[in-house]
Amino acid sequence: MAYRNTVCTPQVIDLETEQGHSHIHSESFNRTGNDSSDQGAQHAVRGVGNATNIGLSDMRSYYDAGMNHPHQPVHNLPPNLGVDSGFVFPSSMYNPCMSTTSMNQYVSHTQSFGLPSNQVVLGSMDEGSRNENAGESARGFIKRKNAAVAGSYHCANGFASSSSSHASLNPTHRPWDPSFESNVLPNTASYNPSEYHSQTSWPSMEGSSIPSNGFNLMGAHPESAQHGNYAFPTSHISQCFQPTSNTWISQSANGIADGIPQWEYVNGMNNAPGRFSRSGMTETVNGSFREYQNGPSTLCRGPLPYFHQHAGMHAHNLLDHTQVQAPYQQCHNNPVLHGVNHSGNRFHLGPRIPVLFSNSERTFGPPHHPLLANPVNHRNIRILPPEHATIMDFSRLYEVSNVVDEHRDMRLDIDSMTYEELLALEEQIGDVNTGLAKSYIVEKLKTSLFVPGSSCMSNKSSESSMENDACIICQEEYQVKECIGTLDCGHRYHEDCIKQWLMVKNLCPICKTTALSTGRRSG
């Protein structure tokens, strides 16, 4: 079986560009052995210091188990060797993560940028299994300290300043070397271990960052240390991962249980953590979903998170709009919340990712909206004021009260009413006098004697007179020489019947016209 030593040095992101994209440089990427994708190849793990490589065969067996089953947790993990073995994993397989508090004892997960062309600086772990990364950028100098406890622990990291530390399990050793307290490392000599096969130093933004005594120099943004952190798997990023596809590394499901470190090995191409950064005055967004806090010997390993392959998310204004996927967040035994800090990072994250509080203050993220395929330019969005918005007309709703007809009593159907109902209605309405006076009727009404065969019995003929044989009011026929009254329209009635009628109304019962005019006198 072929063996291969893979050396991937730590990676640095240049955050001082003004174009909005992070420039990542790579000066050297040394690899020995066969570089082809060989699933049967094994990685050699070398101990640091005077420690012997005890139990490497067991590690290889677990390594192969993780290769064959990349997403299944390893239940029987190798025990602590009890010696200062200080296994050094290839540095490209992990990157130091940010520690949110100075009380963290161990950070179990690792990171890798997974981006092409990386700016790299060399470094290794010393005999005390400690590591330090310090760097300078265009805006200032920051120092990065990494320390790991003695034994099979790989380094736990700090980022903000020297106050971010990790206590060693051996109280006899000092947690930090006095040389760590310096913020400037002038005239440092180049120290490149032979096993790293390095050729030269890797430059940062303003000169060269030269490692010395197993400490790494790393250029980073000075303002990035004050913001929350998170990471997504680089397998869901559009950029490629530099190592070959058969790279197997310790993933984010690592933890500590009863003082013994526990690892799970997963294919680096399938579930390699990555780091996202933003340039300019914005902040670095780094970290991990599996970052444990405030847990002295209470951290327990958990299962690997399950990543949905079809739930895409878009990070706006981030490395050419990189498309990432939102992982499913599982619960941990640690009572501290894990997740993402929405402090100005413009990541529109889904509601499945909780919030990681780095301090006692509670932060609230922006409301979750439906994600768009392309980033929206918020400057071009026009928000109308309330007075310009569409107003609904609710006037029809208030017309319901007018459904009741206030004049319904005046719209009675008298044609279907009985006589008793008409009398009752007459009593309610009262007497309405539109007729003529009796004296006026006697004066104006034309009278005559009925003679059968003659159309008119009066002295003055009338063209409008009409001959009828019966009175329409009393419905009786006229008798010979009976007195008949004639109206102006020519209709004839009994004298007594028409007088009573005219006293009620001055209308002809047949044609409904004016019965007697006020300007004429009877002759």
UniProtKB/Swiss-Prot annotation:
One molecular function GO term is: ubiquitin protein ligase activity
Q: In which pathway does it act?
A: Protein modification; protein ubiquitination
Look up and give the organism this protein is from.
Answer: Oryza sativa subsp. japonica (Rice)
- Give the Basic and acidic residues compositional bias ranges: 18-28
The protein's name: Probable E3 ubiquitin-protein ligase ZFP1
- Region feature (Disordered): 18-43
Q: Where is the composition biased (Polar residues)?
A: 29-40
UniProt induction comment: Not induced by salt stress.
* EC top class, as a word: transferase
Which reactions are catalysed by this chain?
Answer: S-ubiquitinyl-[E2 ubiquitin-conjugating enzyme]-L-cysteine + [acceptor protein]-L-lysine = [E2 ubiquitin-conjugating enzyme]-L-cysteine + N(6)-ubiquitinyl-[acceptor protein]-L-lysine
Q: What does this protein do?
A: Probable E3 ubiquitin-protein ligase.
